[in-house]
């Protein structure tokens, strides 16, 4: 590890195979905590390369417990996190709106590391019991059109790294990796990323797969469609800038997306918004993200996807999906 760290600090890069080997070593406990922490922080000081990201992804997927969800044509709706914006759980709420529109969601999530509350924090506080059983994921999808894969249960080899990430409390390349290592390998993906550079890296990697994808990055730094300004959209077919007005929404202020200071705050917002009792700003932002997810799977216009998302939320079908999900996973 000393040699690897010296190379990285001197702005040298790892090959894809070297990156895979290092991450495999991290997983096996080959390195001490100081070495692991140093390795994680190097990538805050210099950009990660495509080859390094591919190697880290290869190791994570090789070490994970896979879930076979063939036939469900599911989508994962998630962000990398690490944007420092402390928004409410937009992608989690959006996922249930997508499920309420009868589009299958295979969501992969975790506890918050650099934020107050990740998707796992909110769902756990609502009574969800996490499972690492692949058959349980299928039962959940059949009952509610959504399943939730709590990352530590499907990536057990990463148990050595988790405590160090929590102690650091800052974004690391594991934030970049999270959306790429969904153990169900869903054929569709909506992913929000915290930088334009990472959006382009994701675009390059996904263009070399069979995945049907949409990658978003708000130009003011959000890892999702925030409606606080224009956002970059990269998909199989296009790379473009999109304004809130094009989607039929007004430009929002950052304060309107605040997620509170505790898990309890985040949970309350989740319940209020999913009950169609959220503010106009909260509703707009979840509908835009859910609408893009629906349109990605169905290959329709984003505005059509937003209309389906609105119907899901306003009819109560999104909340019904959550209630069925909770019943199956508690």
Role assignments for model-derived ranges:
Residues 40, 88-144:
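A glycine-rich phosphate/pyrophosphate-binding beta-strand-loop-alpha-helix module
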Residues 75, 110-111, 182:
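Conserved catalytic-core motifs characterized by acidic clusters
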Residues 79-84, 109-115, 154, 219-220:
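Acidic, glycine-rich active-site loops and adjacent beta-strand->loop/helix elements
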Residues 1-87, 101, 105, 252-257, ...:
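Acidic, glycine/proline-rich low-complexity segments that act as flexible tails and inter-domain linkers
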Residues 38, 93-97, 285, 289-292:
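Short amphipathic alpha-helical face segments that pack within enzyme cores
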Residues 7, 59-65, 87, 102, ...:
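Glycine-rich anion-binding loops and their surrounding alpha/beta cores
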Residues 17, 92, 117, 121, ...:
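A generic alpha-helix surface/boundary motif
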């Amino acid at each position: 590890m000393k040699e690897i760290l010296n190379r990285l600090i001197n702005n040298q890069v790892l090959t894809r195979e070297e990156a895979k080997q290092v991450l495999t070593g991290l997983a096996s406990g080959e390195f001490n905590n100081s070495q692991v922490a140093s390795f994680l922080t190097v990538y805050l000081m210099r950009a990660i390369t495509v080859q390094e990201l591919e190697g880290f992804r290869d190791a994570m997927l090789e070490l994970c417990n896979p879930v076979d969800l063939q036939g469900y044509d599911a989508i994962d709706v998630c962000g990398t996190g690490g944007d420092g914006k402390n928004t409410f759980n937009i992608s989690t709420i959006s996922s249930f709106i997508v499920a309420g529109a009868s589009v299958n969601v295979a969501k992969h999530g975790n506890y918050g590391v650099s934020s107050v509350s990740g998707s796992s924090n909110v769902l756990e506080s609502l009574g969800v019991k996490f499972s690492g059983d692949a058959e349980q994921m299928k039962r959940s999808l059949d009952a509610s059109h959504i399943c939730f894969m709590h990352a530590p249960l499907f990536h057990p080899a990463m148990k050595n790294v988790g405590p160090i990430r929590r102690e650091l409390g800052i974004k690391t390349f594991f934030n970049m990796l999270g959306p790429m290592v969904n153990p169900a390998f869903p054929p569709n993906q909506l992913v929000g990323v915290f930088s334009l550079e990472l959006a382009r890296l994701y675009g390059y990697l996904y263009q070399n797969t069979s995945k049907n994808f949409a990658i978003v990055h708000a130009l003011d730094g959000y890892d999702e469609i925030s409606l606080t300004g224009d956002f970059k959209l990269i998909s199989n077919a296009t790379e473009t800038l999109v304004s809130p007005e094009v989607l039929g929404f007004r430009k929002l202020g950052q304060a309107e997306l605040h997620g509170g200071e505790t898990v309890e705050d985040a949970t309350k917002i989740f319940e209020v918004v999913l009950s169609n009792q959220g503010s106009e700003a909260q509703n707009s932002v979840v509908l835009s993200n859910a609408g893009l997810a629906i349109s990605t799977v169905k290959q329709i216009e984003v505005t059509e996807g937003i209309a389906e998302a609105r119907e899901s939320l306003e009819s109560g079908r999104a909340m019904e999906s959550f209630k069925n999900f909770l019943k199956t996973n508690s």
